[in-house]
Structures are given as structure tokens and as C-alpha cells.
């Protein structure tokens, strides 16, 4: 049985696919596999920790988060500036009645299921049974971003639409998926964002088309493809040829 304590255990990470795993495989198969096997660890950036700080508040695990991440404090024991800003973000969100309503569901609800016969695990930030699935995101801002030559919503760039499709499929009741979002700007912006069902359906088809290959990679049945751009690929790169500067 999966619990909050063993959700990210090596055994469960290998046994189950997750939304974050799937997105990692879409970005770089080799890097995703190395991370699952414990051969590579993503850098714990300040930006990531600020978002996790806000998450921990809503999970009611902030004291534990502080204990596990002493780097968020100065030598004198005060919160560093970035995490004081996280406190301000929380304060701002708590002043908004609608935001709090969507975040008032059951917290960190774990569910398992299958997509294309592949086991998946999900953890829902705020679950309103029979009504909606809500996921909390804290980001730099709400501006569109460039990816592969296209200017896209951050929802598409970070794969939150794919996450929504997976959550909806595993929850099993075709519930609407919403993002409660806040920015890390000096004066935080906030929004409740819906993703249309046709977009979720499109993303679920993407998952179905790729998940068997990713599962076979996890099982060692096929070799992962390297992207040659991520930190893992850079750290394990072996030069085999000389390249022309115009190819850079």
C-alpha cells in the first residue's frame, strides 16, 4: 500500500509511473531513468524550494519541511528573504475566499490505477470527491514562454495539462481538473485555471501513445534515448567527434 511516507520510495518509483516521471521521460529518457534508479539527483534550487514551502503550508507539514531543509534559514536562524516572500505569498492566498475554497478539499490524496495496463500513482493536492481535482502551482509569473519556437502558456510548457489528464484518468470519475496558481513576484498574482476537456483528452492520448515505451525502459527491455541537453546528459557526455561551430 502506498502512503505519504513511501510514496517516493525507490521501490514505488520503479513499480509505478507518475505524472512527474512521465513528463521527465518526455524530456529525456536517459535522465528520467537515471533519476529513478538513484544515479542522478536534480538540483534542489531555491525556486523549487519556495514552491515546496507554499505546498507544505497547505499540506500542514511546514514544520517538517523546515526541519528537513535547514538551508532556508540564515546563520542567525531567521528565514532567508526568498522564504519570507513565500510567507507573504501564503498570506496573500489566504486572503482570497475563492482560492481557499478550492484548496479546502482533502489534502494529498493518494490514488493508484492503470493507463494502458501500466500502474500509475497520483497525489492530489486538494480533492473534492465527486466535484473537482485541484493542483497547487507556484511559479515565477503567468507570462507565456517560448518552447520549440512557439510561445505557449506555462500550463503547456511545464506539462500541467499532461498531469491533469493523468490525474483525471486515475481518479476515474472524469472530474474537472483545476490549477490553483500563484506567482513569486514581489506582489503575488493568483488565479484558478481550468483546462478544457478536449485538451485533457488530447494529452491522455499522448500518455497512451508513449507510456508502454517508458515502462519498457524502466524494465530494462529497451535502451533510453539521450537528449544531450539536460544536466544528466551533460554530466555523462563522452566526446566522440569534433563539431563545426555553425552546428552550435
Regions found by a protein language model. Give the residues of each.
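Short, flexible loop/turn elements at secondary-structure junctions
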Residues: 109-115, 128-130, 138-140, 234
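Metal-dependent nuclease catalytic cores that hydrolyze phosphodiester bonds in DNA/RNA
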Residues: 1-124, 225-231
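Secondary-structure boundary elements
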Residues: 98-101, 128-135, 169-176
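Metal-dependent nuclease catalytic regions and adjoining charged, substrate-binding loops involved
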Residues: 83-90, 154-158, 166-248
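Short histidine-centered catalytic/ligand-binding loop motif
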Residues: 40-43, 75-78, 146-158, 195-198
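Conserved catalytic cores of phosphodiester-cleaving nucleases, focusing on short active-site segments
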Residues: 122-150, 167
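Short amphipathic alpha-helical face segments that pack within enzyme cores
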Residues: 53, 162-166
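Short, glycine/acidic-rich beta->alpha junctions
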Residues: 118-119, 158-163
Amino acid at each position: 500500500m502506498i502512503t505519504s511516507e513511501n510514496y517516493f520510495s525507490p521501490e514505488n518509483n520503479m513499480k509505478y509511473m507518475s505524472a512527474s516521471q512521465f513528463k521527465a521521460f518526455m524530456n529525456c529518457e536517459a535522465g528520467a531513468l537515471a533519476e529513478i534508479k538513484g544515479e542522478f539527483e536534480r538540483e534542489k534550487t531555491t525556486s523549487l524550494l519556495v514552491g515546496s514551502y507554499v505546498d507544505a503550508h497547505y499540506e500542514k507539514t511546514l514544520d517538517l519541511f523546515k526541519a528537513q531543509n535547514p538551508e532556508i534559514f540564515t546563520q542567525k536562524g531567521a528565514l532567508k528573504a526568498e522564504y519570507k516572500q513565500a510567507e507573504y505569498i501564503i498570506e496573500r492566498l489566504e486572503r482570497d475566499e475563492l482560492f481557499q475554497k478550492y484548496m479546502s478539499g482533502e489534502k494529498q490524496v493518494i490514488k493508484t490505477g492503470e493507463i494502458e495496463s501500466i500502474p500509475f500513482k497520483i497525489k492530489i493536492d486538494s480533492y473534492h470527491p465527486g466535484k473537482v481535482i485541484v493542483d497547487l502551482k507556484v511559479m515565477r509569473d503567468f507570462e507565456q514562454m517560448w518552447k520549440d519556437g512557439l510561445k505557449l502558456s506555462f500550463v503547456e510548457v511545464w506539462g500541467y495539462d499532461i498531469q491533469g489528464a493523468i490525474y483525471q484518468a486515475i481518479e476515474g470519475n472524469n472530474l474537472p481538473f483545476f490549477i490553483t496558481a500563484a506567482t513569486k513576484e514581489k506582489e503575488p498574482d493568483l488565479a484558478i485555471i481550468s483546462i478544457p476537456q478536449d485538451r485533457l483528452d488530447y494529452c491522455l492520448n499522448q500518455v497512451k501513445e508513449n507510456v508502454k515505451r517508458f515502462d519498457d525502459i524502466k524494465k530494462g527491455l529497451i535502451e533510453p534515448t539521450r537528449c544531450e541537453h539536460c544536466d544528466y546528459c551533460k554530466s555523462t557526455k563522452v566526446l566522440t567527434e569534433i563539431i563545426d561551430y555553425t552546428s552550435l
